[in-house]
Regions:
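Sequence/structural segment immediately N-terminal to covalent heme-attachment motifs in c-type
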Residues: 17-37
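C-terminal capping alpha-helices of c-type cytochrome domains
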Residues: 86-129
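Short, solvent-exposed loop/helix junctions and linker helices
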Residues: 27, 57, 108-112
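Gly/Gly-Pro-rich "capping" loops immediately C-terminal to redox-active cysteine motifs
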Residues: 35-97
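Protein kinase-like catalytic domain
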Residues: 34, 68, 122-126
């Protein structure tokens, strides 16, 4: 089974059949806000509110942290179900974030591997393109 997962994760992440694409588009529903093309024009009620992923300067590690932890005081949800239980998110606890806590995801939380796959998809499909 591990070999199947390793093979699936090695598929070009920009391919519509890749697990990374499926997580971005469907499971995490990133496209709802960021758009299917990552341009920040997803939600028709708030066009352009989400960042254009083509223009991000975030590193892979920073993308992983943003996906896992969300963005305090914004609508960017956290996808790690344990976010803010300790200080692994921006060095902050839930008590320190308080009312600025990022919302829960619209979908189910993601595993660490799925969060990494979304970051890899964003880097391969959008950043600098």
């Amino acid at each position: 089974m591990g070999a199947v997962v390793a093979f699936a994760m090695s598929i070009d992440p920009t391919c519509a059949q890749s697990p990374s694409f499926a997580i971005y588009q469907d499971k995490a529903d990133c496209q709802f806000c960021h758009g299917p093309d990552g341009d920040g024009r997803g939600d028709p009620r708030s066009p352009g509110k989400a960042p254009d992923l083509h223009k991000t300067a975030l590193t892979r590690e920073q993308l992983i942290e943003v996906i896992a932890c969300g963005r305090p005081a914004t609508e960017m949800p956290h996808f790690d179900k344990y976010a803010y239980e300790d200080k692994s998110c921006y060095g902050l606890s839930a008590a320190e974030v308080g009312k600025n806590m990022p919302p829960d995801p619209h979908s189910t939380p993601l595993t660490r591997r799925e969060i990494e796959a979304v970051a890899d998809y964003i880097l391969a499909a959008f950043v600098g393109k």
